[in-house]
């Protein structure tokens, strides 16, 4: 049985594929998650995160951008965008506690991104979580 951490990792992979131009990923997300042994409650959790991010992607990007300071959102790598979008979605639109979300995103950054990415993710998501003190937004 997959853990929530594994489910989040699979969601980041789906978001990465979507950001890279694979529009078909929406249609096959469920089967891809099942191939990764994400089933039952974790499958429902992963699909709710994936679909939630896609449904609110413009709003999520608008939440992230003010916290980037000297960075241009469009110039971020696809993996960094995927992790930030997942983290921002969970911070803004789910009841999961912010420290848990930020820690999970840092760990995903260690797994999937460049060596300096976890510090970057921590700074952005921490700043965002402090701004969004009332949860959830939806």
Curated annotation (Swiss-Prot):
Lineage: Bacteria, Pseudomonadati, Campylobacterota, Epsilonproteobacteria, Campylobacterales
Gene Ontology process terms (BP): DNA-templated transcription termination; transcription antitermination
Keyword Cell wall biogenesis/degradation (UniProt): no
Protein's name according to its UniProt entry: Transcription antitermination protein NusB
Keywords recorded for this protein, A-Z: RNA-binding, Transcription, Transcription antitermination, Transcription regulation
Matching Pfam families: NusB
Cellular component, GO, one term: cytosol
Matching InterPro entries: NusB-like_sf, NusB_fam, NusB_RsmB_TIM44
Gene: nusB
Function summary: Involved in transcription antitermination. Required for transcription of ribosomal RNA (rRNA) genes. Binds specifically to the boxA antiterminator sequence of the ribosomal RNA (rrn) operons.
């Amino acid at each position: 049985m997959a853990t929530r951490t594994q489910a989040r990792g699979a969601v980041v992979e789906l978001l990465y594929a979507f950001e890279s131009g694979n529009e078909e990923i929406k249609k096959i997300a469920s089967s891809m998650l099942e191939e990764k042994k994400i089933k039952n409650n974790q499958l429902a959790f992963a699909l709710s995160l994936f679909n939630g991010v896609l449904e609110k992607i413009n709003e999520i990007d608008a939440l992230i951008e003010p916290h980037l300071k000297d960075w241009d959102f469009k110039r971020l790598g696809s993996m960094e965008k995927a992790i930030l979008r997942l983290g921002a979605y969970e911070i803004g639109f789910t009841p999961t506690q912010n420290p848990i979300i930020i820690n999970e995103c840092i760990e995903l950054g260690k797994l999937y991104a460049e060596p300096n990415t976890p510090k970057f993710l921590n700074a952005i998501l921490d700043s965002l979580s402090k701004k969004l003190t009332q949860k959830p937004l939806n």
